[in-house]
Amino acid sequence: MRGGGLICALVVGALVAAVASAAPAAPAAPRASGGVAATVAANGGPASRPPPVPSPATTKARKRKTKKPPKRPEATPPPDANATVAAGHATLRAHLREIKVENADAQFYVCPPPTGATVVQFEQPRRCPTRPEGQNYTEGIAVVFKENIAPYKFKATMYYKDVTVSQVWFGHRYSQFMGIFEDRAPVPFEEVIDKINAKGVCRSTAKYVRNNMETTAFHRDDHETDMELKPAKVATRTSRGWHTTDLKYNPSRVEAFHRYGTTVNCIVEEVDARSVYPYDEFVLATGDFVYMSPFYGYREGSHTEHTSYAADRFKQVDGFYARDLTTKARATSPTTRNLLTTPKFTVAWDWVPKRPAVCTMTKWQEVDEMLRAEYGGSFRFSSDAISTTFTTNLTQYSLSRVDLGDCIGRDAREAIDRMFARKYNATHIKVGQPQYYLATGGFLIAYQPLLSNTLAELYVREYMREQDRKPRNATPAPLREAPSANASVERIKTTSSIEFARLQFTYNHIQRHVNDMLGRIAVAWCELQNHELTLWNEARKLNPNAIASATVGRRVSARMLGDVMAVSTCVPVAPDNVIVQNSMRVSSRPGTCYSRPLVSFRYEDQGPLIEGQLGENNELRLTRDALEPCTVGHRRYFIFGGGYVYFEEYAYSHQLSRADVTTVSTFIDLNITMLEDHEFVPLEVYTRHEIKDSGLLDYTEVQRRNQLHDLRFADIDTVIRADANAAMFAGLCAFFEGMGDLGRAVGKVVMGVVGGVVSAVSGVSSFMSNPFGALAVGLLVLAGLVAAFFAFRYVLQLQRNPMKALYPLTTKELKTSDPGGVGGEGEEGAEGGGFDEAKLAEAREMIRYMALVSAMERTEHKARKKGTSALLSSKVTNMVLRKRNKARYSPLHNEDEAGDEDEL
């Protein structure tokens, strides 16, 4: 189809050329391919209205989707020249209309020549702004304080007596507890001072009040004595303890009866105590609360501190020397001791004044590089070391407003002096005293401004010059008084998270970078505008229309009137009402051509047709005075609507879109510095240990102490079993104990003997319970019976024949001797082996005296038992018997003795 149109265009071009050669004033016909222009009459006028040029909006659409036009039949040779030219004009108009429809959004403007009614001038160069930066940058070192959430800790001593009353029922071989009553009683002040601390002993009784009645408990149900305190078996890392007894006292054993036993264990225990702000109470490590301030006392106005107890329950002792109950050593320095008795215990602790002992703020961070910058109505303290930014007011914060803040100034000065001596001593000097600011979030900043030595010398020189320039008699300006601090005090609350300061630091970091970048861009932009203003002033002389339109922001026409420009507003013309002609040659002047294409347009759709010339950038000029000599090889591209029209040899060739022409950018790339990387480090306001330790009660420590109490102050390994002899031994022991030292000595012997007997009996009993033991005992009993039988026979024999029983061998010899030799054969026998009657009589007399001696001894023994009178009576009786019973025998001769001696 495009080939057929091209042939038609060539035919039309040939005919137009022939007409032009016949009439010299007629312009040459262009070659129509793709886009065509309206034909021009031989006399230079338009032969017909050309079709509109396509708009640029549809150019890309046509490139994306190429729509083939309907196929037309090939043109047949025209019968004559006029018919061929008419057909070519119709084809050109149709093609131009199609182009106009595609580029309907292109706008044309008619700019009338300015008359000078409106004149404008260029603005003078502006003063470029400066970059927005922080003011009063100051370098220095800082100490950041936070709220002190740690409790006040101190050592305390508890004095109490554990009272245990047990009810036991005893069986024969077992015992059963019927009830156990346990209570805790406080130790009186006098006993604490005079007994425990002075001698290391404690009374065995406990006097305390229950149900508003005073009661007394006696240890072991006995009279009151002093018991020595001994160290506890188990000691913790943070405390020690002492007590008087390990074992619980059980009552004496009486079978089938209920008995009661009382145990009083005096305990002295060192514990940790803690108190939190406002220090109105404290709690012990055992979990016991004391509703009194640890700083309460009678010295230095401490009586105004809080207490919930009566005055007689509290006592303060000056010059108190504590004693170590383990080593019995006495402290070298005295203290002021507070004593408080409660219904359950007595507690003692060393009194100290409140003001220097506690502080509501504590040091958090020491920053050796802190930058202070003023932004608006606030200071911003930034540190790269901790990656945080703190925001404060411009006014300083008075330390007198901080409740219990005496440590702030002292700790701040010490830390600042230490950091300055370590890092800045040789290069900087301190400027004034430390300044204090309250930052958002409850952080108190102690800031010490620093100044380098070089700047300090410059400031000193400048100050000296100013002093030299002042008149000598000038009076110094009065110093401004510092604003008075608020008399009321407050406690600074610090947030537990520092994330807001980290975000503030990030925001300031980004803000500083962006503001720096935008500031540089603003300065560069301003300077560029000032530089371009010179170029605009020169360019307006060359093309005032373009300069004025670019400056005003809309299409205007302009011309120079000296140093000012006269401008007039351009009238827009719809693209459908503009027609471009196909020839740029001047028909009436051979060799002269138009430098820009000719156009015909209407202001309105039905308005009259106006002839003009296409200006720059779709401007429609009302005149056709843009001429130039015709040249060979002429090629031009002109903006027409949304695209370009191409003329070759001053004749229309074709139309193309702006996308078909390579674009050369006149913009300069802006090189912007990228934001540098910044790494955040973990930063905690309060550590896990500080948060755990911030509470008033440490439940772990309380549970540990409660479960360790029995292990420390009681013997859990000794077992007392049911024993029937325990009552007997207890009675004997009590009996001998009441007899004094001698009784106790005798009691030890007796108890040993009784213990041996009981042990022997117990051994026999256990031996009998064994089968082999029972058999052995049976054999022993049988042997004993046999021995008793023989002994009984011997006694009977002794009664019947004593001599035979006593002298069995002698009587046996007498029986076996010759019977004739005894008293036979007259006198010889009498003289020889017969019985001597005198000797028999003597033997009887001896037996009688032996019986008499036995009777006298028995009588005297009985008289000794009866008394002195009986003894005298016995003596008299013996004397009488001796006088009555004189000897009735004559002395024996010594013949036998002499004979015996001769035989020897």
Swiss-Prot record:
Motif, Golgi targeting: chain positions: 849-852
Membrane topology: Single-pass type I membrane protein
Motif Internalization motif: chain residues: 889-892
Comp. bias intervals (Basic residues): 60-70
Signal peptide: 1-22
Residue ranges of the TM segments: 772-792
Annotated glycosylation sites: 82, 136, 393, 425, 486, 671
Disulfide topology: 111-570, 128-526, 202-266, 359-407, 593-630
Location of the protein in the cell: Virion membrane; Host cell membrane; Host endosome membrane; Host Golgi apparatus membrane
Residue intervals annotated with topology Intravirion: 793-904
Quaternary structure annotation from Swiss-Prot or TrEMBL: Homotrimer; disulfide-linked. Binds to heparan sulfate proteoglycans. Interacts with gH/gL heterodimer.
Protein name: Envelope glycoprotein B
